[in-house]
Amino acid sequence: MTYGTRYPTLAFHTGGIGESDDGMPPQPFETFCYDSALLQAKIENFNIVPYTSVLPKELFGNIVPVDQCVKSFKHGAVLEVIMAGRGAATVDGTHAIATGVGICWGQDKNGELIGGWAAEYVEFFPTWINDEIAESHAKMWLKKSLQHELDLRSIVKHSEFQYFHNYINIKKKYGFSLTALGFLNFENADPVTIK
């Protein structure tokens, strides 16, 4: 049987942070801190595969908080994600990390939903921050990026932008912050036939 390309129909948003005084070179924050961030995000038992940032229209209205679907997670499964995640070491002058994912939806000239796009945001801070700073910076930069996605394609905004963010004030040697969309259910487009 021939299948067309696969696209997600259900997604969830999540986020997590991690920090540690231990790690392995060359990027010590990529080991223990990243694992802790995945655990807090409740996606630690998936094999993570990153996506770029195009969303099918079937996801509109079908992006839920992670807690609504975590009981259905399958240990060892592949989880395709759009993720903004980075780590840092305080010795390099970073004392806080903010991350975020934003979503925009576009419409055609008749006002019909076409689909959407996501944007990722990561920012390093030399001092500790609070949630208000993390949220305002995430929205500022994601709004700019999402509008660029629409303008690049000459597409009109269909609905309000959506934003998800996270941050960490690093109290140990290393820290990691992530914000992600994970994709769970899928359908297939019609197969392509060449005549």
Swiss-Prot record:
Its cofactor is pyruvate. Its EC number is 4.1.1.19. It is found in: Cytoplasm. One of its GO terms (molecular function) is arginine decarboxylase activity. It catalyses: L-arginine + H(+) = agmatine + CO2. The record marks 52-53 as: Cleavage (non-hydrolytic). Keywords: Cytoplasm, Decarboxylase, Lyase, Pyruvate, Virulence. GO terms for biological process: arginine catabolic process. One of its GO terms (cellular component) is cytoplasm. It holds the Pfam family PvlArgDC. Binds 1 pyruvoyl group covalently per subunit. Its main location: cytoplasm. InterPro entries: Pyr-dep_his/arg-deCO2ase (IPR016104), Pyr-dep_his/arg-deCO2ase_sand (IPR016105), Pyruvoyl-dep_arg_deCO2ase (IPR002724). The modification Pyruvic acid (Ser) is found at residue 53. Belongs to the pyruvoyl-dependent arginine decarboxylase family. Trimer of an alpha-beta dimer. Part of the AaxABC system, catalyzes the decarboxylation of L-arginine. The arginine uptake by the bacterium in the macrophage may be a virulence factor against the host innate immune response. This is Pyruvoyl-dependent arginine decarboxylase AaxB. The gene is aaxB.
